[in-house]
Amino acid sequence: NWLLEIAGGNYFVYIKRLSANDTGATGGHQVGLYIPSGIVEKLFPSINHTRELNPSVFITAHVSSHDCPDSEARAIYYNSRYFGKTRNEKRITRWGRGSPLQDPENTGALTLLAFRLNEDGGDSTAVDIWVCVSPDEEDIIETAIGEVIPGTLISGPAGRILGGLSLQQMPVNHKYTIPEDWQQRFPSGNEI
C-alpha cells in the first residue's frame, strides 16, 4: 500500500542500493546517503546559491519501513569554495540516530526515498523512506522498475518511475458476469 500511495502522489523518488559508505560500514567519518547534486538542487532550490556560506534547509524524514522516530534532516550546500576554502558539494545530513539508512546491516538493501514535491516549485519539506528488509520486498519493487544494480540509481517523478505499480492496482469494470465454470478454467477463443 505504501508503494501505491507514493506512485499515485506528488513525489520525486530516488532509488538505490545502500553502499557501505552510505551506511557507515566502511568506518569513514562522513557517514551519509549519497544523493547527486543535481537532485538536491531540484528538490531544494532555495539552497542553490553562493550569496551566503553553506545555505541549508530542514526536511522532515519519516521511515515507513522501520519503527524509528521521525527526524529533521538537513539539505545543505557546502559552498566554501566560493568563500576561500575548498568544499563544493550538496548533501542531505542528520538522518537521525537509529535510522536504517545508517545501519551497516542494511548495506546492499534496496532503498526508496520519496520526496514530497512542493506544488509551487519550492523546497521539498518531507521525505518518506523505505529500506527493504527482505528479498521479497525487493522483488516487488524490481518487478515494476527493473533490477537495481549496486552503484546505480533511479530517480524521477514517482508516477513515471513507479507507474507500473499504480496500473496494476486499477479497479476492473465488472459489467459482465463471468460464468462460474470459467472461474476454474478459462476457455480458449475457439471454445467461446
Segments from the language model and where they lie:
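Intrinsically disordered, low-complexity acidic/Q/S/K-rich activation/interaction tracts characteristic
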Residues: F12-V13, R87, R91, L165
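Elongated alpha-helical scaffolds
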Residues: K90-V127
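Long, contiguous hydrophobic alpha-helical segments, chiefly transmembrane helices and signal peptides
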Residues: L18, A75, T111-L113, I192
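OB-fold ssDNA-binding interfaces and closely related basic DNA-contact patches used
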Residues: N1-S65
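A broadly used, surface-exposed interaction patch
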Residues: P45-P100
